[in-house]
């Protein structure tokens, strides 16, 4: 079973180009929405990094094993954490344009979202969809994807983003989240958009070297390389899964 985990501020729409190229049937994969991202946020759900990890582990346990998991952005971070906790459920894993790295201090927007009051002010600006759409495209989100994602960035998602980033102190990871990576299964893969303005390629290279994980760099692609270069990503995944 293929399991695709999106990031922030995305929804499962992220995976549509890739799933189309892979020609997967509905019985071949799952691409759930993170709670609060284009869907309701369950009562009592705290939207912290630990809460989302528990949610993802639950998704994996529901499948039961033999999982080929793929994660992007926060979905990549949650994938790494969940897989390190339950490697027994995973056949292969692949993450794109985000990794758990103790030296990475977070991009500018992550630090703003993590800051009380400032984060709320940023989110007020994100309510203006006419301005947000071109801003997302300028940040590297493919236009066709942005037209689907931006309308779904509602109050629930905005609050979930704030809660998530604050639980991670922006994007600063340490202790078990880092040390647990030693438990990752061997069949891992990195797929990276070369020009990502949020997470520099050097972060991917450092992770690749430290944990001995193959790194594919997609020249000229940005943070959403998994959608922008869906054909190339599909080719890599098919080889990775073989």
Regions found by a protein language model. Give the residues of each.
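The conserved beta1-alpha1 loop
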Residues: 5-7, 72, 192
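Catalytic histidine-centered segment of alpha/beta-hydrolase-like enzymes
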Residues: 221-234
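Gly/Ala-rich beta-loop-alpha elbow adjacent to hydrolase catalytic centers
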Residues: 71, 75, 79
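Conserved alpha/beta-hydrolase catalytic His-Asp/Glu region
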Residues: 104, 126-183
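Conserved HGGG/HGGXW glycine-rich cap/lid loop of the alpha/beta-hydrolase fold
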Residues: 1-41
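Conserved serine/cysteine hydrolase catalytic core
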Residues: 159-208, 217
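Active-site loop/oxyanion-hole signature of alpha/beta-hydrolase fold enzymes
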Residues: 30-70, 235
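Flexible "cap/lid" loop of the alpha/beta hydrolase fold
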Residues: 84, 92-122
């Amino acid at each position: 079973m293929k399991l695709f985990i999106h990031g922030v501020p995305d929804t499962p729409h992220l995976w549509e180009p890739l799933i189309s190229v892979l020609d997967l049937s509905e019985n071949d994969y799952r691409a759930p929405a993170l709670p609060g991202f284009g869907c309701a946020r369950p009562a009592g759900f705290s939207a912290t990094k630990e809460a989302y990890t528990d949610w993802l582990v639950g998704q994996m346990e529901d499948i039961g094993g033999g999982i080929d998991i793929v994660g992007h952005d926060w979905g990549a971070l949650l994938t790494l954490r969940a897989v390190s906790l339950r490697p027994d459920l995973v056949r292969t894993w692949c993450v794109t344009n985000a990794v758990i790295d103790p030296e990475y201090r977070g991009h500018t927007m992550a630090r703003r979202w993590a800051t009380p009051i400032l984060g709320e002010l940023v989110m007020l600006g994100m309510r203006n969809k006419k301005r947000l759409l071109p801003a997302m495209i300028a940040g590297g989100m493919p236009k066709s994807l942005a037209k689907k994602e931006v309308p779904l960035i509602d109050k629930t998602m905005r609050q979930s983003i704030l809660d998530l980033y604050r639980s991670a102190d922006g994007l600063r990871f340490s202790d078990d989240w880092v040390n647990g990576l030693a438990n990752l299964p061997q069949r891992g893969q990195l797929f990276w958009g070369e020009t990502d303005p949020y997470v520099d390629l050097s972060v991917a290279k450092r992770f690749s070297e430290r944990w001995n994980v193959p790194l594919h760099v997609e020249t000229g692609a940005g943070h959403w390389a998994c959608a922008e270069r869906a054909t190339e990503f599909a080719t890599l995944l098919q080889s990775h899964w073989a």
